[in-house]
Structure formats: structure tokens, C-alpha cells
Amino acid sequence: MNYKIIIIIFLTVFSSNKLLLANEKIDDYKSSPEGKISNIGNAKYNIAKSYMAVTADPRATISAKRILEAGGTAMDAAISAQMILNLVEPQSSGIGGGAFILYYDAKTKNIYAWDGREKAPINFSESIFLNSNGKKKGFIEAVSGGLAVGVPSLVPMLEKAHEVHGNMPWNTLFDDAIKLSTEGFIVGKRLAQLSSRAPHLKNQETAQK
């Protein structure tokens, strides 16, 4: 099978036949969502011949691997992995933001670029970051919640890219993220720490959705 290569701001899926998480499942990481931080000098590397998926979270990597093994393209795998990342590390890779894609088609040897950077809303004004008394909000309060998010462009970009480079049904690429969110997962340390610094989020309607 000739896999295409995709390089995305949130995910890299390479053409390899061996994967670090070859026999593991998403459920295996319910109690260990984050890998240990170690000296980069001790980092290991792998060489693959058929496909390889690399993400910031093992559950997203496993999801990408599953899609590739089911006959999906690298774009399909990237989308499925992104939905997992949106769930387990929304502070770093949420669908409420934007991204860029560089996609290499091994058959045509063409490189495709997709721009999904978010933009400010048309009616945006600096007053959004001011309190009712006219003074500016603190940093954490200002950047937390829906008002600090630009017009999301990530999902529309993925949908358009999928129309060109994907072959699995669009809705099936959300299955792993839906399953993980429905069954529950342990929140990683970084997300827990950042959430604790923004207790006002529980009172924001936009943050609760």
C-alpha cells in the first residue's frame, strides 16, 4: 500500500511499517495519559518502512495507526488524531483554533499547502478584554474562554483537505474521540494545572460547551 505523507502543525504521519505503539490500544492509556519528560539526549528513534504516526499524545498516535491499518490515507489518520488531541490537550491543539498543512502526494510527487489559520471576528474590538469598569482583564482571564478564540478555521480546513486527500467517510474519523469522551479519560497534568489557574471558566457559558 502506498501511503501519502502528511506534515501538520499538530501531527506528523509518515510513510513506515513499524510503530512504537504497534500492539497498544487507546484504552491502555486511561491511567497514563502523559509520557515521562526526559533528557532529549536519551531519546530513542525508530525507522519505519510503511507508515509512522507521531503526535503529542499516545492515544492520538494509536488512533492514527488504526486509521492507516483500516485503509485510510495519511490525511484520514491526521484528522482522527487531531480529534483526540482536541479532547485530551485542548490548551495546545483545540479545534477552536487554526493550523497549516503541508501534504506530499507520493504518487504525483506534488506538495499541497492548506491554510487554516483562524481570524478575528468581524465585530471584534479591544473592549472584549476590558472589565465592566474599563480596566483590562488579567492575562489568564483574558485568554481563557470562548471570547479569546478567533473564528475557528481548523475543521473547515480539514474538511476541504479530506475532500481531496481522504478516502474514509468523514464522520468515521470522529469515532475514536467520541468513544474516548463518552467513556471518560484521565486529564493530563498540564491541562489540570492550567484549568486550576482559570477557575472562572466554570461560570462561563462558552467554556462549558
Predicted region positions:
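N-terminal secretory signal peptides that target proteins for export/translocation
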Residues: 1-2
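Sec-dependent N-terminal signal peptides
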Residues: 5-13
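N-terminal signal peptide c-region/cleavage motif recognized by signal peptidases
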Residues: 15-17
